[in-house]
Structures are given as structure tokens and as C-alpha cells.
Amino acid sequence: MEASFGRGEIDMALVFSERFSDKLYTGEARVQLVSDATDPNMATMQAGYAANIISSAGQEMLPPGVHAAAIVPQLKLLYNPQMKSAYNFVPGVMGLILMLICAMMTSISIVREKETGTMEVLLVSPVKPLFIILAKAVPYFVLSFVNLTTILLLSVYVLDVPVAGSLFWLVVSLLFIFVSLALGLLISTVTRTQVAAMLVSGLMLMMPTMLLSGMIFPIESMPVILQAISAVLPARWYIQAVRKLMIEGVDVSLVLMEVGILATMAVLLITVSFKKFKHRLE
């Protein structure tokens, strides 16, 4: 059951006491609800629905004329027994900030060079395109790690959000930063002004990350079309992986799917953005 929770296959499990059907007539039947509480609002809603269904079903199972005490399920909360909302939004904030710093700031920084005319100076210099890209990306890479460390310290020491799992989430964060930097570079190749770069970054990255990545709304409750759109957002897989590693403390093997998707996105985006950027320089 723990493995199923870790893989995200289930959000709630029902555990029935031994000889449940026999004890139902004597009012001694017990049911335990085991719920994933990383999202407190969703866990509360699911527990309420399940308790009502169990109570109604228990009464319907009794023969006519037989009365027994209603079944009151015992609730067990996994990963977030205190039902703190910080457990849910901290991974989302991490994904949003990294996306904004890496993608938006990188694209604006490169487009600024075009507007001021300094890009032409770089074109006539013997500097290779790769070094131009690195010179623009490295500062935001370092800044992203500084912000990541700051968020982690605030989460642990101010919000009391523990880091339950291994530090492999740092590797996942590094991968996500590469993806975000590649997105910023790609945006810079299709925009000519800083305002355009900011609008494209905001509309294509910031708003979808906030609304469709699972940061605020559970992905399972979205319409099918929005779930399909969210599948192409890097932030969705990053937030999902960080929640599993930091909050649930699952084994690294249970986030291989998310890591594989992010790695594929990183390779594709870095390849495409570098080729387009090199073509624009030439």
C-alpha cells in the first residue's frame, strides 16, 4: 500500500477490520481511512465523502429490523498529519520561482542585447555562440540555486516543512533549471523586444505553471483537455517529483518517470534552442 501511495496510483485506501461482516451486526466493525495528506484540502474532501459513503453503506447492509451503531471511520493521514498547507505549496513555489528566474530573465537578458545593439558587437567578435549562451545563462543558473537554497531554508526553519527523503531532489532541480534555461533561450530567438519576451514568458510559462502544473489545483480534477496540456509543462513533472521526494520521502526509483520526462525535455529544448540561437547569430 505504501508503494502504491508513493507511485501516485492511489490517494486513499480503506482498511477493514477482521471479520468485518460478522462484527457489522454487533456494531463492532471498524474501518480505517488511509489518506495522502500532501494536499490537505483534497484529503479533507475525500475523507468526508468516504465517511458518508461508508456510513450509508453500513446501514444498507443490515437486514430489516436490525439496528447497529453507525460506522465512524478512523482517519490516518500520511506525509502531512498536521494538515499544513505549506506541505502542498512549497514544491509549487519552488517550481514557479525557478521557471520565472531561468526562463523569463534569461530571455529578457538576451533580447536586451539585441535592442541595445551590443549583439552585433558579439557577432563580429571571435567568441563562439556557445560561450555567448553560457555567459547569459550561468548567472541565472547560480541565482536559481541561491533562491532554491533560500526557499528550502525558509521551508524547514520557518514553515516547519521537513525534508523527508533523500537529496536527490537537488538533481531533479538541476534538471529543471536546465529545462527552464533552454525555454528562456528559445523565447529569445522568437522575440525582438524585452516587452514581447516578458509577455511570451508570462503567457506561455507563468500562467500555465500556476494553473495547470498541480501547484494550486489537483491535476486529477481538471478536464481531460487541460490534463493533456499540463503533460507538456516541465513544472508539472518537477513539482510532482519534488513532492514525492521531499514530502513523501519515497525511494528514488519511484520518481524515475518524472526524471525521464524532464531529461527528455531538457535534451530536446537545449538542442532546438541552441540551433535556433546559432542560426539567428549567423
Go through each PLM region and give its residues.
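Transmembrane helix boundary and interhelical loop/hinge segments in multi-pass membrane proteins
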Residues: 8, 104-125, 137, 282
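Long, hydrophobic alpha-helical segments
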Residues: 86, 90-106
